[in-house]
Amino acid sequence: MLKNNSVISINDLSDEDLNLIFNTADSMAGNLKNGSQIKTMSGRIMATLFFEPSTRTRLSFESAMQRLGGSVISMADSKSSSTAKGETLADTTRMVSSYSDIIVVRHPLEGAARLVQKFSSRPVINAGDGSGEHPTQTLVDLYTIKKSFGDINNLEISIIGDLRYGRTVHSLLLALSRYNVRINLVSPDLLRLPGHVMSRLKNIKINEYNDLNNVIESSDVFYVTRIQRERFTDKNDYNKVIGTYGITEKDTEKMKENAIIMHPLPRVDEISSSVDNTKNAKYFIQAANGIPVRMALISLILGD
């Protein structure tokens, strides 16, 4: 059950939870389309603690809470908070949980979201912890695939770019291992999927490639990620891999008729702007899906 529970990893959610979230997201999307007023979170407060830059995720969560009739208190810049004075994450968490009903946290250190959960008296949602996981982005990704194809099973899904540091990739692969799918991992050798993630992927067919051309004609889903410059400790390594892959409008001509291109955003040069108006481009729809999906998750955690 989701009620009053935290979501730190995608593995904190059962298959039944996923289906419930997607069905609830459909209802939320319908309400948004019809302009229906939702007040189920009236009187509830969400605290957003973002120790790392964010545009889509933070605004998506805050918009979702407000559209449910709730309110938001926000720390969008750790430099202006007491953490800049040396306050520990544990103490910050204790204080913020006394001000709110639910906490959404993003932090540059892997494992930080679990620490927040440990010291919080309220449910916690992980909005990204370093190169660890980003479970709500995975919910949005799965929902987008499901809405595009009607099902997630029996698809060939190619994940392209920074597989080493990309937390969206790690969460997505853990979730996809529950389905009957074929996975292609396309990356430079420097950015291959870490062994600790690969070892957790059971009963799933995975192929690894360096060349995008190996998968361009056969894939149903292209999940493209930016190279995470901020995670590199050696700038020379970053310079070796920047610009390795870039999908252009010409590439879409080689794809299946109904293939979709996704990206968790922000993008740099991984997808040309010429792709934006093609029928394959789904990344802006994917971003928009974040609102009903996060509305669904919040309402299921805090609902009566």
Curated annotation (Swiss-Prot):
An example Gene Ontology biological process: 'de novo' pyrimidine nucleobase biosynthetic process
Pathway the protein contributes to: Pyrimidine metabolism; UMP biosynthesis via de novo pathway; (S)-dihydroorotate from bicarbonate: step 2/3
EC number: 2.1.3.2
Catalytic activity annotation: carbamoyl phosphate + L-aspartate = N-carbamoyl-L-aspartate + phosphate + H(+)
Source superkingdom: Archaea
SUPFAM superfamilies: Aspartate/ornithine carbamoyltransferase (SSF53671)
Pfam family of the protein (one): OTCace
Molecular function terms, GO-annotated: amino acid binding; aspartate carbamoyltransferase activity
Binding site for L-aspartate: K85, R167, R226
HAMAP family xref list: Asp_carb_tr
PANTHER family in the cross-refs: ASPARTATE CARBAMOYLTRANSFERASE, ORNITHINE CARBAMOYLTRANSFERASE, MITOCHONDRIAL
Assigned protein family: Belongs to the aspartate/ornithine carbamoyltransferase superfamily. ATCase family.
Protein name in UniProt: Aspartate carbamoyltransferase catalytic subunit
Organism: Picrophilus torridus (strain ATCC 700027 / DSM 9790 / JCM 10055 / NBRC 100828 / KAW 2/3)
